[in-house]
């Protein structure tokens, strides 16, 4: 017959807090999982946060720069196509371009001045976003860390203002087109006009990102002097873990020691009797 090998299994039961009055409570606990940032120093965490803010600020600057270049590139082109109903003649015009035909609008301002208001809001939008980009580029070149807290808020506000002005510009241009082509012509907006809407969306998106970057930069900095109390969880993940302070645990221990001393003394006293 083959001899069966006897295997000995040992289980590790670490010391855990005990419930008062229950000596059989032996639920093993293990430390909770640590976050990767818990082992980092406060200086390293702050350095990573500053680097992330710089990357986000660069993204906002790139969006605004791309939108501005696209806006400037579309401005000298035609935005609308006119079709004369009587003879089928096609005419083209834009915000800054005018056709020489008598049916097109002229350079002379006429009420309700939709075209002039549209041009004014276009210029305000361009100059506003140029101001924000100038602040961003100056912060990158000079590397001024003192103004970074309010820089994101300023860029966000300028992006929203520029997007609002561009929105008014596009709506006023459409109003000018509808007013000019009442009965004699039909109008059709070209792809160059719709690309300006993409620039407006990018301005809004950059403003939202910059605002979120400003809100996250206002979070309190890490303090190395703050003591962190480690947490414990059940190994099985079921039920709460009771924590008993050493001061409270001394009472049950002293009672248990006194009971054990009495039990030892009782047999001795019986011998004397």
Curated annotation (Swiss-Prot):
Q: Where is the composition biased (Basic and acidic residues)?
A: 247-266
| Primary residence | membrane
Family matches, as InterPro entries: PMP-22/EMP/MP20-like
Q: Which domain of life is it from?
A: Eukaryota
Transmembrane portions of the chain: 53-75, 121-141, 155-175, 189-209
Q: How does it sit in the membrane?
A: Multi-pass membrane protein
- Region ranges (Disordered): 242-273
Coiled coil feature spans: none
Location in the cell reads:
Membrane
Gene Ontology annotations for the cellular component aspect, listed alphabetically: plasma membrane
Sorted alphabetically, the keyword list is: Membrane, Transmembrane, Transmembrane helix
> What residue range is the signal peptide?
none
Q: What is this protein called?
A: Transmembrane protein 202
User: What organism is the protein native to?
Assistant: Homo sapiens (Human)
């Amino acid at each position: 017959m083959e001899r069966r090998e006897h295997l000995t299994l040992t289980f590790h039961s670490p010391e855990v807090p005990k419930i008062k009055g229950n000596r059989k409570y032996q639920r093993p606990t293990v430390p909770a999982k640590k976050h990767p940032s818990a082992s980092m120093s406060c200086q390293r965490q702050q350095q990573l946060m500053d680097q992330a803010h710089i990357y986000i600020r660069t993204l906002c600057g790139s969006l605004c720069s791309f939108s501005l270049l696209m806006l400037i590139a579309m401005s000298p082109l035609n935005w609308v196509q006119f079709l004369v109903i009587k003879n089928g003649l096609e005419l083209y015009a834009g915000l800054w371009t005018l056709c020489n035909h008598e049916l097109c609008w002229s350079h002379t301002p006429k009420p309700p001045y939709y075209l002039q208001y549209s041009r004014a809001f276009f210029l305000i939008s361009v100059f506003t976003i140029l101001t924000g980009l100038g602040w961003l580029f100056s912060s990158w070149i000079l590397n001024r860390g003192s103004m970074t807290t309010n820089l994101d808020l300023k860029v966000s506000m300028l992006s929203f203002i520029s997007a609002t002005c561009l929105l008014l510009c596009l709506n006023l241009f459409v109003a000018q087109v509808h007013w000019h082509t009442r009965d004699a012509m039909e109008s059709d907006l070209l792809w160059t006009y719709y690309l300006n809407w993409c620039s407006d969306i990018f301005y809004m998106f950059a403003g939202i990102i910059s605002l979120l970057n400003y809100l996250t930069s206002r979070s309190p900095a890490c303090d190395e002097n703050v003591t962190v109390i480690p947490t414990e969880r059940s190994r099985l993940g079921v039920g709460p873990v009771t924590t008993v302070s050493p001061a409270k645990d001394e009472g049950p221990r002293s009672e248990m020691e006194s009971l054990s001393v009495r039990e030892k003394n009782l047999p001795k006293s019986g011998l004397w009797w």
